[in-house]
Amino acid sequence: MEIYNKYFFNKINFNSFSSSPGWVGYFYARDLTMQSVIQMSSKMIESFFKDSINDFFLLTALAYDDSASIPEFSDLEVSYYESVYNKAKEMGMLIPYNGLIEDFYEDNKYPFPANIMSLSFDKKDILSFCELSMAYKYNKVVGDHCFLINPTLKIALYPHEDIGYGCISLSDDCSKAIEFLNFCS
């Protein structure tokens, strides 16, 4: 884990992702419904990284707020996202919005407290959790610290607002990140 710490903490600025030393940019889909944007964004990741998708893991510092409203989606979409939301809570990928995480997000206490982070190596759920963070952002999911990290390719992707994904190179060679963003454009 020490080698990963070198990548994470030197290359990702947790206070301002676009100020990260390896920040390359972000992509988003235009003129689509929110649901379409979310799904298209994940499909782009799956398509581009199809040969290395299993090398990704998820690093989050997200909280849940059960009292918040649900965004306007179809009944089928709400059913899907509620299922993912409950699974994320059960797996500890979303933690209760209180204590240290509340202090961090409410008072902007820095530096970023590493002990509020969660990891998931469950390949079948990591993209669903990213989609959830976009769909329920500013509602039932609190925070925006959600990273898909591929240590082999030395790249970190994060849900960018509710429109796509941002891209941070975890090495001085940004070519893979640039190639990915060009693929998405």
Identify the meaning behind each predicted range:
Residues 1-164, 169-185:
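Structured alpha/beta or helical-core interaction and ligand-binding surfaces enriched in interleaved
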